[in-house]
């Protein structure tokens, strides 16, 4: 099975300016992500960026870069520009690898690529079990509920599903029904082209979760349990210090 991994690497970040280029043991973070993607077996790994310094860093490490506009509202919109630039056919499998996850396990990149290749759904993604009360109630940890076929019913920053009987007694423990979404996506190039033509949905704008646009327009998202649990990504200076320590 062949697939292309695309890494959106936006330079501007409110909480961590110049995030793709922050140093982790002598390499820019985006280069670490690129190396993990190459280890996944992708036939091609492309870093999509709006900043020339990011492009130079990737090229210096032997990577492939596609320069994109700076006004994209989401990583998926940036991907759409890349697939049109390269004129990928509609059936080409594309995996969107987040540019701020330098410790992403290569096996889950391959997993999501296989899942979209084997299913007739619009999008494939992954989740991991929630194992703490703090995570279940943390709005920064996106939860997902699935149907019997493993397709997403809804993604939310809220605590879903709400365990009515358990939580009526206490919110000090959780059951086994919670899944945290991991922000990695697999699609076919043609689906990305359709996605960016859709208007943003009300639910997407309320939750600030772009995958809700897919459900709003009646498409399916398959959610598999990840074969390996990735470390959290880098959003803040504190996250960066944690990742540096973990990667020693």
Curated annotation (Swiss-Prot):
- Quickly give the catalysed reaction: 3-deoxy-alpha-D-manno-oct-2-ulosonate + CTP = CMP-3-deoxy-beta-D-manno-octulosonate + diphosphate
Task: Give the transmembrane ranges.
Answer: none
Q: What is its EC number?
A: 2.7.7.38
- Identify the metabolic or biological route this protein is part of: Nucleotide-sugar biosynthesis; CMP-3-deoxy-D-manno-octulosonate biosynthesis; CMP-3-deoxy-D-manno-octulosonate from 3-deoxy-D-manno-octulosonate and CTP: step 1/1; Bacterial outer membrane biogenesis; lipopolysaccharide biosynthesis
A GO molecular function annotation here is: 3-deoxy-manno-octulosonate cytidylyltransferase activity
Q: Which GO terms describe its biological process?
A: CMP-keto-3-deoxy-D-manno-octulosonic acid biosynthetic process; lipopolysaccharide biosynthetic process
- Family annotation (Gene3D superfamilies): Spore Coat Polysaccharide Biosynthesis Protein SpsA, Chain A (3.90.550.10)
Cysteine disulfide partners in this protein: none
Where it sits in the cell: the answer is: Cytoplasm
Q: Name one GO cellular component term.
A: cytosol
UniProt KW keywords:
Cytoplasm, Lipopolysaccharide biosynthesis, Nucleotidyltransferase, Transferase
Q: Which domain of life is it from?
A: Bacteria
* Enzyme class (EC, first level): transferase
- Predominant cellular place of this UniProt entry's protein: cytoplasm
What family does the database annotate? Belongs to the KdsB family.
Function, in words: Activates KDO (a required 8-carbon sugar) for incorporation into bacterial lipopolysaccharide in Gram-negative bacteria.
For this protein, the record's NCBIfam families field holds:
kdsB, PRK05450.1-3, PRK05450.1-5, PRK13368.1
Q: What is this protein called?
A: 3-deoxy-manno-octulosonate cytidylyltransferase
Q: Which organism is it from?
A: Erwinia tasmaniensis (strain DSM 17950 / CFBP 7177 / CIP 109463 / NCPPB 4357 / Et1/99)
